[in-house]
Every structure is written in structure tokens, then in C-alpha cells.
Regions:
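SAM-dependent methyltransferase catalytic region
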Residues: 1-205
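Sequence-level detector for compositionally biased, low-complexity segments
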Residues: 122-124, 146-149, 168-287
């Protein structure tokens, strides 16, 4: 089962995966590390840091012999899949082979924290607004086509592009799990996006962490703390989308709101508690 973080940054998701002995048992670790984990990053410094962090995480559990991590790819994830485009092959010659191997691999799990773009404040932001004709055409044929909103610019935000790209990349079976701006949950312009999620996935899990600081007064206090601290005013949501042809669910929505008036530390504690419950569910009550 191949795993991909298409926007890895400094490798946090992959590092935590490798360090977690429940998610990554010892008998699976070497195979995953060598052959079944991929991550993409467009910034050179972050790419090198991610590689170092991932190698350190692996060797903290398997210290006997140094094994380089070959799943890191220096690339623009969206651009490398554009039809008729050879940008990556020309710009990133040192890892051309890895780009081609990743493109040929069947990807079953995609996880990450996609960048945002709509409303960015600086032209030097990591998430520059770039046109991706093939990807944007897919959005036009799906999310935009199904929308009744007059203004559809938000459907081309980088994180919405990430959902469209990942949905197509896993094909007929797999999991997409992203930590993103939570604005898509109730924004009018996102109606077509929400509709497509129900149509394209068997199961939809959403953990709404709230934190929308673009609100005012009592509503702002109810939204609570910002998960990413002072660096973001947007609400945050954790979303997991499951495609499984054998599932009895079809467009089933499993939604949880973290609650009102919680500061950042309280939210993080609640997230940890939920993770512990998933890993070690309490016994069912006797009848």
C-alpha cells in the first residue's frame, strides 16, 4: 500500500507515521520506508530538511545500518501531472527517475496539509497562484459544474485543487486525509465541492476544529483558539475521505464539531483524546 504526502514541507506527517509503532509496526517499517512511502516538496530547503527528518525518524527505530530515504521528490505536485507538461523533467533533473517512479506507482493513501491561495497577502507566499490547466479543467467539470454559486473563484484555491487532484490520483480505491482551511464546510461557493464529495466517496469523516477569527464578538469567542496559532485566522478542519467499492456506505457523512469556547490547548488535548480513543476504544457496555 503506497502512501504519499504531496505537500510535505519538512516531513512532519511522514515522520510521525514512521515513529508511531501502532500505525507502523516493526515488521512493516523497512518495506514501507524503502518502497512504499512518497513525499513531494517544491522548496529546495524544505525538501532537504524533510529528507533528513524522515531518515532520522526511521533510523531512530532501525539504527543498525544507514539506509537513505529515496521517496522524497523535489517537484510541484500539481505541475508534474499536467498533460503534455515536461517542466519537472527539465527543472529537477537530479530526481527525474523518482518523479517517473512515483507517477507510475499506484497510490492508495494521500495525507497532508495543502497550502492555501485565495486571499494570500504576499506575492512571495509559498502558495503562489498558478494556473494548472488540466487540474482546473477537472474542477470546472466537477466542483464548478455542480455549484449554484455565482462566484466560483474559491473552488480554485490550492487546498480545493488538492482535494480534486488527490481524488483523481487514488482512482477507484483509497483514502485522502487532509488538514485544511475549514471554510469549505459552510461557504456558499463550495456547494459544488461538497456535493461532489458525497457523490465520489463512500465515507466522509470531518473533524471541525473551528477557530475562525474573521468573525466578531460572541461568535469569535465561540470559535475559540486558532490551531496554528497567530499565523492563521482561518477555521481548520481535518477531513478523511474513503473510496471503497465494497463498502455499504455511499456518501455517508460522519461529522464532529470540536465545541464552543475552547482555546488552542484545549482543542489539542481533545484531538489527542480522540486519537487515543481510536487507538484503544473503550469496551462496550454490557446489556
Amino acid at each position: 500500500m503506497n502512501i504519499l504526502d504531496p505537500f510535505t514541507g519538512t516531513g512532519t506527517f511522514i515522520v510521525n507515521l514512521l515513529q508511531d509503532e501502532e500505525l507502523m509496526p516493526a515488521d512493516k517499517l523497512s518495506l514501507k520506508y524503502r518502497d512504499e512511502i512518497w513525499c513531494n516538496e517544491i522548496l529546495l530547503l524544505a525538501y532537504y530538511i524533510a529528507t533528513i527528518n524522515i531518515e532520522y525518524a526511521y533510523h531512530s527505530r532501525v539504527p543498525e545500518k544507514y539506509v537513505p530515504f529515496v521517496g522524497a521528490v523535489l517537484t510541484d505536485t500539481f505541475q508534474m501531472y499536467e498533460e503534455g507538461d515536461s517542466l519537472d523533467l527539465e527543472m529537477f533533473t537530479d530526481n527525474t527517475e523518482r518523479i517517473l517512479e512515483e507517477m507510475e506507482a499506484s497510490i492508495h493513501v494521500i495525507v497532508g496539509n495543502p497550502p492555501y491561495s485565495i486571499g494570500q497577502k504576499d506575492a512571495n507566499d509559498n502558495n503562489k497562484n498558478v494556473d494548472y490547466k488540466t487540474l482546473d479543467s477537472r474542477i470546472g467539470d466537477t466542483y464548478a459544474k455542480g455549484s449554484a454559486a455565482g462566484l466560483k473563484k474559491g473552488l480554485y484555491d490550492q487546498y480545493i485543487r488538492a482535494f480534486r487532484w488527490a481524488t483523481d490520483r487514488i482512482a477507484e480505491r483509497g483514502i485522502v486525509s487532509f488538514v485544511t482551511n475549514g471554510g469549505w464546510l459552510d461557504a456558499q461557493a463550495m456547494d459544488g465541492f461538497r456535493k461532489c464529495l458525497v457523490e465520489e466517496f463512500n465515507s466522509i469523516y470531518v473533524f471541525n476544529l473551528r477557530g475562525n477569527q474573521r468573525t466578531q464578538g460572541e461568535q469569535s469567542r465561540k470559535e475559540g483558539g486558532k490551531i496554528f496559532g497567530s499565523g492563521s485566522r482561518a477555521p481548520i478542519a481535518i477531513t478523511m475521505l474513503v473510496k471503497n467499492p465494497a463498502s455499504e456506505e455511499h456518501g455517508a457523512i460522519h461529522y464532529h464539531d470540536i465545541g464552543d469556547y475552547l482555546d488552542r490547548e484545549m482543542k489539542l488535548a481533545k484531538i489527542l483524546l480522540c486519537r487515543m480513543w481510536v487507538a484503544h476504544p473503550p469496551p462496550r457496555a454490557l446489556p
